[in-house]
Amino acid sequence: AFEIRTINMNHLLNAFITPIDRESIYRVVTQLDSIAVSIKHFLVEAKAYNIHVLDDGFIDIFNKLLQCTNALNSGFLKLGTSHELEVIHNTQMVRDSYDALVNEYVIIMARLAKSNDMADVFIHRELLIQLREIGKRLQGCANSLEDIVIKMR
């Protein structure tokens, strides 16, 4: 992730664009970098807690993250084309998927709250927080992508 970020930043600094555009692109690059960092943090925590298999409820959260990622990727691929409205639709899909992710998070947390195994509750809560943070960062990146589209019009 660091190498990709460095390459992208070098391209950005050498591009002939307005400062506003450069700021928007920089924001997206740093947000993508923060997503990679959040994923790394999730993996570090899962490894530290020796977690190899997660509760079934996590599958729904991972699916929501995948939906966010696919919609964001699709939006970026359409950036700079004549499909601005599709990019806006993709960014809304990211926000909708994140909202659904938060709902899944609450359902799992409510179920965990009924458990007497505090170590299990703590571990799963920490992992869930990391996943929710990844989703939040994806949503922030989608908002910045939408900002770029609006500035391009």
Label the predicted regions:
Residues 2-153:
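Cytosolic, long alpha-helical scaffolding segments
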